[in-house]
């Protein structure tokens, strides 16, 4: 029987069939649908992976360093010193600390450094697992997925440990639903302790963006659990285990690192504005502007622009405005490099913005970034509509975590839902966001299929979560929610939630009682 025969069928019944169970298959030759006739290794593998198959249901695929949602790594000519320092710390068998916390303000480049470390640790065969928290990404803001995701990666990084994890979960499939302390113990620590041969290389677990995890108490709890790991006698693989944690320097996170057990086993690195950071940002700018100048997308508009472009003085001015925050050059380069506009004109807009005094930058390092965000929003043709769409998307993404199973099932086009609930015409949302592509990622290609029985959505969009609309950086969300930073562009989440709730009630009156994708969407606000 072809194994794909029933792949796309549901509610299939087979009556009067005859099935033969083959326990012995000696002497079988040839191939069956491309699979070698000796099925023992395959059957053994299927049996072996029962526990891992259960565990995978609790894995946040987008949170891993190598997922399709992964963050960019550092430019190869930047952050060399800090990355080299951390790699040396990992590889030092005599190091006194087992936890490294590098922290910094929004936009300092923490995630890019963490991504680069993951890549290097994979090459060195040191990486056991990683988890990149994200407040507005599906399945990446909830700590319940943290240890199952890391454990699943660990099972493949160290196969002997993977066999133990598989057996443990197959014996007790409820482990991923238990308290985090039990998950850590059963899915990571005990399997590492049971390996017969102690690993000679470091075992590295990287947790990025802990401040993006839901709830201050949960963030503190995760840190306490990591600290408790090293209060126990080192056995087996745990002897070489180390954790790297990145976050903003939030007070409650900082407090955990100042008390035992973490205080005595943690090395801290702060990512602030230094001369080296400025040099790295200058390199980043130079490389990015060169790429824009030489891009085929700008061949006609840039062919007569002489290098170096822009001038060294302009780059120095932009470096000063960055105040050590890598998100600033990243946003500038996306804005200037937009293929729909002439790069020289876009750069002139930024250069002509009012200067910010050094004293203002000293007290408000994000002042230049805020000015840049405001400038980009001011260029939108329909400012109020743009803000409405932005805040509606923020509200829906904020509600996703409570309905993560439903969203994984239906995978709705959030932009079309926002248009409907805000009484806009189809396409108004895309048009409103067209001018701010440097701030918001809009998917270029969506695979769509008709949903004939749903009055809200005429189209159900089949895209992976990483292909959906997303904000390029969380600092833009912070800007929109802080009236002292965004001023006239500040958004009111409470007001928008009320508007969406009222629109949902009106819309749901037209639905049948069946659980369609649109009913799920509207139920977020009720």
Name each model feature, range by range.
Residues 503-526:
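Extended alpha-helical scaffolding segments used for macromolecular assembly and cargo binding
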Residues 1-497, 501-506:
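Conserved NB-ARC/NACHT P-loop NTPase core of NLR-like innate immune receptors
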